Amino acid sequence: MSNGPPSPLESLEKTLPQASYLDAGEFQREYAAIFESGWVCVGRSDTLTEPGDYLAIRLRDQSLLVVRAENGELGAFYNVCRHRGTELVPLKDPGPVSGQFSRSIVCPYHAWSYHLDGRLRGTPHLAIDADGVSLHTMPLAEWGGFVFVCLAASHDEPLAETLGDGTARLKRYPLADLRVGQTITYEVEANWKVIVENYNECYHCGPIHPELCQIVPAFKQGGGDGLDWDDGVPHREGANTFTASGTTTRAPFPGLSETEKTHHKGELFYPNLMLSLSMDHVAAFYLWPQSAGHTRIQCDFLFHPDELSKTDFDGSDAIEFWDLVNQQDWNICESVQRGMRNKVFEHGYYAPMEDYSLDIRRYVRGRLAEADR
């Protein structure tokens, strides 16, 4: 090692070490401590409106179902028949996939059936007392129309405690009333933390998002330093939303403050929900890590039902603009992931204007420490 003077970079905060982004063993440890030990977001309840509507998704090797029961309640179950372990909804792909059961959930293997609330209904040619037998359940909770499940064997932390103060900052947005207008799924060859770190700072916005910075010049001023995410970031004069023109014919959400009608807000809810909020639409990102170097991202574009019900509704101005911005983000995140494989890379650094990205370092270390207790 060199005995020379310390590098000027040593005055900066360090990222997590290289292995945290690349190593398969570290990924497994981290995934168990975070994604299998607390609340994770799996989608929107407004996509499950009728009895029998379901969402099936595989989170790594854990397969689950979210089902709307006859009484209107949502339930979450492991996607596995009590008989021989068959998937009730086959998932060769991680999903999510959606569909509708008719009167019951029927296993495709031997036709064991279950009520929509998970209770065993029938076992062909077997006289089994169904009372007290049901699909394996898991905790489910909702906030703002978002559905969260928990894979932990025992978990007593309320969802509100996990979500933290961000919910109060978004209290005027009618999130529970919004509906999914369109969904785009991305396969990103980058560690999920690289994506979260990118979301948490705008130091990159000037070089990476020139079109976005035309709408929100504050994103590139001073490297994105001093942005007020609590109250939102102002658009340029005459602009009020994330579209190529910065304008739209869609009305602002009811209930917003005057500031929120002209400012953009962003909120991260660990570990896997990122929200970007304009006055007329919301881009909701769900991150589902597949491996140390691969993350599946679903982006739901949410609009007010009053707008969606119009015969001439067209959300493409927002969706196409967001798709451009997203592709720019995912491309640079993949470049980061490739670059970190170089043997000279030990860790990165956070510039002062990237202080929000420090959250991921604190969060991951905290969750790993909890798991090791």
Spans of model-derived segments:
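Short clusters of hydrophobic/aromatic residues that line enzyme substrate/ligand-binding pockets
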Residues: 42, 88, 120, 212, ...
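Generic structural signal for secondary-structure transition and capping sites
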Residues: 35-39, 86, 204
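Short Pro/Gly-enriched beta-strand edge/turn motifs at strand-loop
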Residues: 37-49, 120-125, 266-271
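C-terminal catalytic domain of Rieske-type non-heme iron oxygenases
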Residues: 146-148, 152-373
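Short, contiguous pre-domain boundary segments
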Residues: 1-20, 176
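Short hydrophobic core segments
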Residues: 30, 80-81, 106, 195, ...
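Non-catalytic accessory segments flanking enzyme active sites
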Residues: 20-59
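Rieske [2Fe-2S] iron-sulfur-binding domain
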Residues: 47-153, 157-164
